[in-house]
Each structure stands twice: as structure tokens, then as C-alpha cells.
């Protein structure tokens, strides 16, 4: 963590204060080793996968491939869910919730300490 950079994630994971310690500790509790917090970019993978949404069924496997690619490129992938809208399953229509989905995605990106994002949606 001796590297200094201007990445957004460094405000979460790169600081050597109490907040930085807490952020790193929570992520390490998920099995991430110490060395991933050395200034690498944190890449969010926003996924609308759901068993209720048939058109998004393939996104679960696709997200795993994206994670491998992010690791191979030197980043740290962190997947996060957002609401999934399935036109064939929602009544009266999924159209009523599209703005809410947009807000869900935008605010999740804004709220988390990520440097980039891959959006997966059907």
C-alpha cells in the first residue's frame, strides 16, 4: 500500500487511518488478501442476473468471465447486484421500473469505492 495514486478506491482502501482499516478489514473478511490493496484499480461488476429474469440468465456465467479478465489485467473485481427487470414476468410492465433501475445503478456506482465498472444487463 505504499503506492500513492489518485484512484477513487484509494480513498476507501489506501488510507492508513481508521476508515481505511475498516474498509480493508471488511473486504479481507471475504477472502481478499492484503496485497490486493496495493493501489490496484477496483473494478465493479454491476449484474442484473436473476432467476426471475430469463433474458438475464446467462449473466451469472458472464460475470465470472469478466472477473477473471479483471484479475488478469491487474485489477480487483467486485461484483454487485442491482434490480433485475424482466418484461415477460413483471406485471403490468417493466417499463414502470426502468428509471428506478437507472437510479439503482448510478447510485451504487457513486456510493462504492470503485474506479471503473462493467455493466451487465439484459
List PLM regions with ranges.
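Metallocofactor- and cofactor-centric catalytic cores in central/energy metabolism, strongly enriched
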Residues: 1-122
